[in-house]
């Protein structure tokens, strides 16, 4: 089977399963694979084995700007294509590259207070209202960035304090919670222009807020507050960790996140060592003499 044709066919087949931003990312992966496999002179998908896998990794390291984490995603995409066409070779035995980036850490109280105070004191411009409500809702709901940006005003259920969400990963519908912590700011944002479709809106550019807008705002936060690696995933980890610290059952958190495996949910929960040692003292009664 011709590699370029197989890759493009699989990409087109899966378009409906993902949102636009993910499809654009997958397209870049496909282009890397087409160029890399052409460079190492492999034309047939059936010829892609563990040796070709090593050569492809070498190409990606030396001819692109991809790090280990990105290369792993490219290789995994190739494996999915081969699996789709029921082609099994020794590439399944190709070892995983080590991670070359640190995982995102949760925010702790001092940093959260800095962020919330800064956003609360933003000016009264329409875009400032967008950003302050966005930050509040991230912490209050644990949403992924794509899920939050795609919320429509009609998705908000203020009576039950839930949001109808289309999962950016599974494409399934679920409901995410929110509370009075973000309610006031969301209502303020809607009142600015209640006739638009999407909740988060770039009023300067007259369009839906996008990921690049959020990245630019995070850079602004980082500069003004001197904080490292501000990212939506850190708010998601903070959401999970604080809820568990406050007594939420891990099974309930799994349902909120709509994870199929509880092991995935556990990865989001992060405590500091001091707190863990203090909590140990509350429960270390073994009932023995």
Curated annotation (Swiss-Prot):
Any GO BP annotation: symbiont entry into host cell
Organism: Acholeplasma phage L2
Protein purpose: May function as an integrase.
Keywords: DNA integration, DNA recombination, DNA-binding, Hydrolase, Transferase, Viral genome integration, Virus entry into host cell
UniProt xrefs under Gene3D superfamilies: Intergrase catalytic core (1.10.443.10)
MF (Gene Ontology): DNA binding; hydrolase activity; transferase activity
E.C. number(s) listed in UniProt: 2.7.7.-, 3.1.-.-
UniProt-annotated catalytic positions: 144, 169, 233, 236, 259, 268 (o-(3'-phospho-dna)-tyrosine intermediate)
Domain (Tyr recombinase) ranges: 102-281
A Pfam match: Phage_integrase
The organism's taxonomic lineage, starting at the top: Viruses, Viruses incertae sedis, Plasmaviridae, Plasmavirus
Positions of the Core-binding (CB) domain: 1-86
Protein name from the UniProt record: Probable integrase/recombinase
Protein family according to the UniProt entry: Belongs to the 'phage' integrase family.
